[in-house]
């Protein structure tokens, strides 16, 4: 990925791919795409209070992981959130 790719606007195929990923993740986690979108928006809102983030590079996934208490697999949220700048903590 080149430096200029960072500033490229997402095309319709990229948007469709992101929507498909969201649908697959929500299916695995047994929650609707609408709930997944609400979770994503809430995470963005809370984190944005403390730092400036790159919402285009944001990647939130719900996957299954093995439980530490031998209860089988449990859902887990993984978030990759690029930080542009930290906000002043004196607000």
UniProtKB/Swiss-Prot annotation:
Protein name, entry field: Cell division topological specificity factor
Similarity section: Belongs to the MinE family.
Organism: Lachnospira eligens (strain ATCC 27750 / DSM 3376 / VPI C15-48 / C15-B4) (Eubacterium eligens)
Superkingdom: Bacteria
Gene: minE
GO-annotated biological processes: cell division; regulation of division septum assembly
Keyword Transport: no
Gene3D superfamilies listed in its UniProt record: Cell division topological specificity factor MinE
Residue intervals passing through the bilayer: none
